[in-house]
Amino acid sequence: MEWNDKGFLIEKKRYNENSLLAEIYTENHGKVVGLIFGATSKKIKGYLELGNFLHVNYKYKNDNKIGYFNVE
């Protein structure tokens, strides 16, 4: 499954070397937790500050498992 939405970054935790476990409050789907791969890269690091407004693409394989975000 996949969906696109807008939301605010409300929590982030470091996961492995270059990923984040992020909690985003979205307009249509509420509070969603997912991984952001490559979150420590120079290109995306500036966008991932708490409270920032983000356009996200969320992909997941199963409703019971965590998915991952692509941030725009």
What do the predicted segments below correspond to?
Residues M1-E72:
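A surface-exposed, charged beta-strand/loop segment in the N-terminal or early-internal portion
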